[in-house]
Amino acid sequence: NKNIDEDNELYINELRDNDLEICKSKKIVTIDPGKNSLIYMLDEGKNKLRYSCCQRRRESLRKRCNKIILREKQKNQIIDEETKLSSYNCKSVNYNEFKEYIKEKTKLNDKVRGFYENELYRKLKWRTWIYGRKSEDKFLNNIEETYGKKEDLLLCYGNWSNNKQMKYIMPTKGVGLRRVIQKKFSVVLVDEF
């Protein structure tokens, strides 16, 4: 009995009357997504909650692990090897040029496979992922502590999404973070004009 868009996400203006009646009994919390403040939340009582990219980066140990990986890459001359590949065009429509690229890419993969299969590299990537999930779970618990039980909440999430990564800025979670929140809370999208 729900109207759903192509991404299987429900917009507030598409709710049916009986769904709207259910929503009226819930506490409404608005969410404004962004690049620096990944999530900025506000309810009717002006209670605020913020989840920033800096907080996520700090809690996930991402920057620290990336520095260690970069240092190891420099020590093992991985960056030099990977830079050689940049002289080839991977998007070429010329058969011979693309064939040369594939040959070089295969040689490079054979040379650097040992580094990427190294236990240190895999542990650092795993640690970043685990601590990232831990940070998200901590934030979800903060939502419940700040606004109440998940059964009593309706989160109105702005549908902003960044289609292109900004230059020199570390990538951040956008739609993925919304999906994490949707697994635990009732979420409807609000069209941001």
State what each model feature region is.
Residues 1-193:
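Positively charged, helix-rich recognition surfaces that bind polyanionic ligands
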